């Protein structure tokens, strides 16, 4: 992030770092407490109306949305826990390749809107902490260009069941406090 003089690095199997400090995705588990980052459509042919519907679906269920910068920076912020999730369409492999390694090495998940890990050539990308990623799939899968209506419904149902099963299996826990330094390090 040149505006903050931060350097994000990752090596497969060795972790993700910001300025030589280990980073991890956020610990939040409830979508309504999360900040989600995204990009905005700007190219001729982008379906602006569809993107606005997608943003409305996400905004109604989260604490807010941000537009920090390039997709690579958005993914770096997910990896550092500054934001809890990310989604965008119209992306090329060079937009997300480095950021995808940051996210996975920081403990997050990344894929297309139906949750499949094969996303590089799909021009749609979604990332987040595992529990948040699982809650974004049913919201965003209906906007995927790569799944039929039946597939989209099945993905939403499976994600909903997975979330319910996880919530039922875990006893109510105290809210995770914000880690010292994390909030003050956030760029917004």
Where are these regions (language model features)?
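Alpha-to-beta junction loops
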Residues: 80-85, 105-109
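Active-site neighborhoods of divalent-metal-dependent phosphate/nucleic-acid chemistry enzymes
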Residues: 84-93
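Hydrophobic residues within well-ordered alpha-helices
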Residues: 76-79, 97-105
């Amino acid at each position: 992030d040149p505006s903050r003089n931060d350097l994000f690095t990752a090596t497969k199997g060795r972790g993700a770092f910001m300025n030589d400090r280990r980073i991890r995705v956020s610990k939040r588990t409830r979508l309504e407490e999360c900040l989600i980052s995204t990009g905005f459509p700007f190219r001729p042919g982008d379906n602006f109306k569809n993107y606005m519907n997608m943003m409305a679906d996400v905004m109604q269920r989260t604490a807010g949305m941000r537009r920090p910068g390039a997709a690579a920076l958005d993914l770096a912020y997910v990896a550092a826990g500054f934001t809890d999730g990310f989604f965008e369409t119209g992306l090329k492999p060079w937009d997300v390749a480095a950021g995808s390694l940051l996210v996975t090495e920081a403990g997050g998940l990344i894929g297309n809107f139906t949750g499949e890990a094969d996303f590089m050539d799909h021009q749609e990308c979604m990332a987040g902490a595992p529990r948040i990623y699982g809650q974004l799939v049913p919201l965003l899968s209906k906007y995927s260009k790569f799944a039929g209506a039946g597939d989209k419904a099945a993905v939403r149902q499976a994600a909903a069941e997975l979330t319910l099963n996880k919530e039922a299996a875990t006893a109510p826990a105290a809210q995770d406090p914000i880690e010292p330094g994390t909030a003050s390090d956030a760029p917004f």
